[in-house]
Amino acid sequence: MFTASGSIGSGSVTASLGRISVTVPVTVTARALRTLDGFETSFATATGTRAMLSYNREMTRVHNGYASARLDYAIGSEGNAYIGLNYAIPSNYDQLNFWVYGDNSGAQLALVTDAGSVNLGALNFSGWKLLTAKLGTATAVTGLTVSSASDLISAIYLDQLVLSYGGLTDTTAPKLSLQYNAASNTVTGTVKDDIDGAAIPTIRVTYDGKSYTSYTYNQSSGALSISLPAADGAQHRVNVVAGDASGNLSRAGMNAGTSSTTPAFNDMKDHWANDAVAYLKRSGISNGSNGNFLPDTNISRQEFAVLLARYLGSSQDHSSVQLPFADTNEIASWALNGAKAMYSLGIIKGSSDGSGKLYFNPTANVSRQEAVTMLGRLTEKGYAQGALKFTDSSAIQSWAAEYVSTLSTMGILTGFSDGSFRPNGAMTRAQVATVLYKF
């Protein structure tokens, strides 16, 4: 028997039966960590002393969620820059954890509180790094200071400020499991976090890609119960996202309902992707052509952009958006608004031929790694990125690897039966339908 005490700590529990022994890690915490700021809500640019804090949505500089904060600073003979912050620190928390995207400038970063300044060390790194600040008796965070003996003009990024205690940091996603009960047409499951327990601040459920709120979650037991709409003879997709106070995300999805024997289009009879294509049809994402879907036909880049725009429900007029592509005039009129919508969101960026010109290549087949990259740019940050395990992982381009890893972890990508991903291979319309259905 294992009995948890009221103190904080971590270790392992080993259970033995004969020659069989199993060891599992255990963390004992007294209370959940607390998100101080994730910068997900847009805020007005704040100006300090030779420093400026602004809202950032450029996803390559986001660690958790969809946004972060950008801190620009300019240091001259004064030797430092300062930006004011205003966060109250509740009792029982004595540490602040937060992510910093460093500029490798060598400047010193310090957190300022009402009890003094906490040195966080040198910005001698590029990319994201988790920093911790001991708060002592402080009751408020009042600012950040960047100092340097030499002149500097640069910027760093901040994300996911989390109040902690006892030296705890959390970089592990919650554990999430789901089961479907056909008799009651419900999905049940459990959500637990090693640090926060069942006090999970983020639970999101989608049904066929749309937000769904007919569920209950017990923050004492971690039990999740989702009551689904009445069965209609079709298969539907239920996805659940769980996020802890530190911004770590986990995701699970499953099919609910009955696989349909009715073909979604004339050419979908007995096709393996019929349920996914039926989802596209009833959601208004694809209406086919002359009663057919052409499931095994490769999809072009402009067709994929249009499907993504429809998937997102983008009905706005983007005619005023100026595309930078040298081949913009080759984009079909029916695809132009979709391409502009995806460009304005930073989903499509084009490619260069080495002459400095950008090309969209609208009629070219979209490759599997290109499609996954576009989907990845739509995905919030915070999911774990495991090692790529496809047999041809070495062929995946560096600009796509992060997204292939993330979508694989999320269960959206499974690869082929031979273990390959085939990054340069074209995607068929059926494959795209399946990915969007799971997404």
Enumerate the language-model features and the residues they cover.
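Extracytoplasmic soluble-region selector
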Residues: 1-32
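Surface-exposed, short loops/turns at beta-strand junctions within beta-sandwich domains
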Residues: 4-9, 137-138, 227-235
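Extracellular carbohydrate-recognition regions
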Residues: 29-52
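Feature responds to low-complexity, polar/acidic, surface-exposed segments characteristic
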Residues: 33, 121, 170, 250, ...
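Short carbohydrate-recognition loop motifs
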Residues: 58-79
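Extracellular ligand-binding interfaces
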Residues: 73-140
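Extracellular beta-strand ligand-recognition surfaces/modules
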Residues: 98, 130-166, 420
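Extracellular acidic, Ser/Thr/Pro-rich low-complexity tracts
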Residues: 102-104, 190-197, 244
